[in-house]
Regions:
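NAD(P)+-binding Rossmann beta1-loop-alpha1 motif at the extreme N-terminus of oxidoreductases
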Residues: 1-45
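A glycine-biased structural micro-motif
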Residues: 5, 65, 91-92, 130-133
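N-terminal beta-loop-helix "entrance" segment that forms/cooperates
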Residues: 40-51, 144
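Rossmann-like NAD(P)-binding element
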Residues: 50-96, 100-108
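General beta-strand structural signal in soluble alpha/beta enzymes
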Residues: 56, 132-138, 182-185
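Glycine-rich beta-alpha junction loops
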Residues: 77, 99-102, 138-141, 163, ...
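Rossmann-fold NAD(P)-binding glycine/threonine-rich loop
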Residues: 99-149
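Active-site-lining helix/loop region of Rossmann-like oxidoreductase modules
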Residues: 155-220
Length: 220
C-alpha cells in the first residue's frame, strides 16, 4: 500500500498532524491536512514552508480526500472531529489513530481520560464501524515519526487493530517511514495498553527534561 501513490487525509493540523502530513508528502503521496479552520494564519504559514505541496481543507474534505485517513487531533476532540468529518467519509478505509486521550486538568503528568475497560482507539472504531482502525504513532514523540534514529539504535512501533489487512497496510507505511521493527499486539482493545504506554513516555520525558527517547522490544 505504501509503495504506491496514495491520497492521504490527515485530520488535525497541530504538531502531530503536520509531522505525519509532511511524512506522507515526503514519500510522494497526495496529502490534504484537515482543520476546523483551514485558513488560520499559522497553518497557511506552515503550508508555505515545511508543508509545501500539501493541501488544506476541512475535516470532512480531508476525510473524503484520503484513501488512507489519519486521525491526529487532540484526544479529547476526537469524537467531535469524527462527527464533523462525517463517518461515511471513512467507510471502507484504513484509518490510523495516532491520538492519546490525555487529561491535563490535574497538572503534569497527565492522566488518561479514558481507561480501564475502554480506550480512545476502541471509541474511534465504534464511531467508524465501516472503517478499519489501526492504533499507531502514539508511543513516540512526533519528531521521530519519520526516519527515527536514536544514539542507541532504532525504536519499535507498537500497533493494534482488528483487521489484519489494515495492520499490514500500516506496517508497510511504517517501513516506508523508516521503521525497522513494527510489533502487532493484537486487536483494537490493545489501545488500552498503547495509550497507557504514552503516559509512561511522558513521565520519562518529564523526569529527564528531554523528549528524545523511545521504546524498543528486545528478544533474548
Amino acid at each position: 500500500m505504501a509503495n504506491r501513490h496514495m491520497r492521504v487525509g490527515v485530520l488535525g493540523s497541530g504538531q502531530v498532524g503536520q509531522r505525519l502530513a509532511a511524512g506522507f508528502r515526503s514519500r510522494g503521496h497526495e496529502v490534504m491536512i484537515g482543520s476546523r479552520n483551514p485558513a488560520k494564519p499559522e497553518l497557511v504559514q506552515w503550508l508555505s514552508g515545511e508543508g509545501a505541496g500539501i493541501e488544506a481543507g476541512t475535516f470532512a474534505a480531508a476525510a473524503a480526500h484520503g484513501e488512507l485517513a489519519v486521525l491526529a487531533v487532540l484526544g479529547n476532540a476526537a469524537e467531535q472531529a469524527i462527527a464533523e468529518a462525517g463517518p461515511e467519509n471513512f467507510s471502507g478505509k484504513v484509518v490510523i489513530d495516532a491520538m492519546n486521550p490525555l487529561d491535563f486538568s490535574g497538572g503534569f503528568p497527565p492522566k488518561l481520560s479514558i481507561a480501564g475497560e475502554d480506550s480512545l482507539g476502541e471509541r474511534v472504531q465504534r464511531a467508524l464501524p465501516d472503517a478499519r482502525v489501526v492504533k499507531a504513532f502514539n508511543t513516540i514523540g512526533s519528531p521521530y515519526f519519520v526516519d527515527p534514529t536514536f544514539s542507541d539504535g532504532h525504536p519499535t512501533m507498537l500497533i493494534a487493530g482488528d483487521n489484519e489487512d489494515a495492520k499490514r497496510a500500516v506496517a508497510d507505511v511504517l517501513a516506508d517511514f523508516g521503521w525497522s521493527q513494527t510489533v502487532d499486539i493484537g486487536g483494537i482493545e490493545g489501545s488500552r495498553e498503547l495509550e497507557a504506554i504514552c503516559i509512561a513516555w511522558v513521565k520519562i520525558g518529564g523526569a529527564r527534561g528531554a523528549w528524545d527517547h523511545g521504546f524498543k522490544l528486545l528478544v533474548g
